[in-house]
Amino acid sequence: MTSTATSGESAVRTYQVRTYGCQMNVHDSERVSGLLDAAGYVKAPEGTDADIVIFNTCAVRENADNKLYGNISHLAPRKAANPNMQIAVGGCLAQKDREGMLAKAPWVDVVFGTHNIGSLPALLERARHNNEAQVEIVEALEHFPSALPATRESAYAAWVSISVGCNNTCTFCIVPSLRGKEIDRRPGDILGEVQALVDQGVLEVTLLGQNVNAYGVNFADPEIPRDRGAFAELLRACGRIDGLERVRFTSPHPAEFTDDVIEAMAQTPNVCPQLHMPLQSGSDRILKAMRRSYRSERFLSIIDKVRSAMPDAAITTDIIVGFPGETEEDFQQTLEVVRRARFSSAFTFQYSIRPGTPAAKLPDQLPKAVVQERYDRLIALQESVTLEENQKQIGRMIEVLIATGEGRKDGETARMSGRARDGRLVHFRPQGHVDGALRPGDIITVDVTGAAPHHLIADDGVRSHRRTRAGDAHEAGKKPSTPGIGLGMPAIGAPKTERIEVAGCGL
């Protein structure tokens, strides 16, 4: 790699953000980029060594820990050769390991948690000035994350947080202890952010929360009363934003899924016919041990209602294999739910012991070989179901939002890729009724000609092509940004801004 490191203190310093984990982390990394851009840092060009490397971490699975510390160790020789280089670690694993991170990786300069992302520029400057590692973990949000600037990664699709934290107590999950109790944003703030993104050409937004259909239980603004119908109304309000073509959300909790949300999904044209709803297990006994607060028939009844209201809806899920005490009978019940639910795809995981969770102390932890064998059977079943469901799409005309980075073999197959409204990945031939160059962010229609377990194929060419402002922005190399609120952070080569007091979460 080419180095971009600089020797003068006044020179512009470059950064790179490496992200692990869920969509919330991806969006948090956009905020990290926004903060550093606002402070005068510059994103390092691809293929170069950055002056500052930030790891935004995940703590859900043990292999995430191992991967992170392995990657940090690879930077130790670079750090030794260039003392001016800085390494920062944030996110859930940093919130969990705290000072212990420095014991494992003493060459790290900054450790920050999930609640104080906004402190990163100040911590970097303090570590540089004092020549001493800085560890700052706080137990509650300093500012609602939406108060922070964000540099978006896509010209056409954007994440929008509607809440942070989680009130559930799933025994396998460490996230609530790291991200805190649920706090909901004001509806007006959310819609204002969506409108600002649409004004910059964004066509698709995904509403983010650990449990989106609990939205309304605890607004950050104490003046707003608790409202269990708030999420359904938020979906309908998104439907009234001119220029917003696609709305998605993730993830709902089956225990709190209400009929008014299904009605809002079906009656709001820009809400996509897609639902990602975690199952975790098809065994009622295991669901109880997980503290999931619903049972398999309740889960299946929600799917039935969604498909009754939206017959073409694609349902996706998460499933954990090998939870402590899971018997072959329990596993067979999971397979039966998979057969009945007909998921269009599933994120499947082998249970991983997470210290600090109730499940870590449960008896009857399963041998690795048993978990692996069950996992393989689940994958085989789900792939057969997915293939059958995808084959049903053959012959249909579908709308596709052209995307970038989705088709790993597009260069070999002379195809481009995008996402259908129901979230399915589509590989298509870039020929036919095309209005100029096809660009990520443009909208096309194609006929599905083939199917595989993980994608659809459209090899008969493009039926129609609509150029969009998102495509214009992508072509020009422009990405949307949301400025947030000035937080008075130190700047490197950027004008100082007047400090603005932030209402934050109202905490």
From Swiss-Prot:
Annotated InterPro entries: Elp3/MiaA/NifB-like_rSAM, Methylthiotransferase, Methylthiotransferase_CS, Methylthiotransferase_N, Methylthiotransferase_N_sf, MiaB_methiolase, rSAM, rSAM_horseshoe
Protein's recorded name: tRNA-2-methylthio-N(6)-dimethylallyladenosine synthase
Function: Catalyzes the methylthiolation of N6-(dimethylallyl)adenosine (i(6)A), leading to the formation of 2-methylthio-N6-(dimethylallyl)adenosine (ms(2)i(6)A) at position 37 in tRNAs that read codons beginning with uridine.
Family, per entry: Belongs to the methylthiotransferase family. MiaB subfamily.
Residue ranges of every copy of the MTTase N-terminal domain listed in the record: 13-129
Cofactor(s) demanded: [4Fe-4S] cluster
Binding site for [4Fe-4S] cluster 2: 166, 170, 173
GO molecular function, one term: N6-isopentenyladenosine methylthiotransferase activity
Main location group: cytoplasm
GO annotations of cellular component type: cytosol
Compartments it resides in: Cytoplasm
Catalytic activity: N(6)-dimethylallyladenosine(37) in tRNA + (sulfur carrier)-SH + AH2 + 2 S-adenosyl-L-methionine = 2-methylsulfanyl-N(6)-dimethylallyladenosine(37) in tRNA + (sulfur carrier)-H + 5'-deoxyadenosine + L-methionine + A + S-adenosyl-L-homocysteine + 2 H(+)
Annotated [4Fe-4S] cluster 1 binding sites: 22, 58, 92
Lineage: Bacteria, Bacillati, Actinomycetota, Actinomycetes, Mycobacteriales
Chain spans, region Disordered: 459-492
Subunit structure: Monomer.
Domain Radical SAM core: 152-388
Cofactor binding note from Swiss-Prot or TrEMBL: Binds 2 [4Fe-4S] clusters. One cluster is coordinated with 3 cysteines and an exchangeable S-adenosyl-L-methionine.
EC numbers: 2.8.4.3
Enzyme class: transferase
Domain TRAM: 391-462
Comp. bias regions, Basic and acidic residues: 459-478
PANTHER family documented for this protein: CDK5 REGULATORY SUBUNIT-ASSOCIATED PROTEIN 1, MITOCHONDRIAL TRNA METHYLTHIOTRANSFERASE CDK5RAP1
Protein keywords: 4Fe-4S, Cytoplasm, Iron, Iron-sulfur, Metal-binding, S-adenosyl-L-methionine, Transferase, tRNA processing
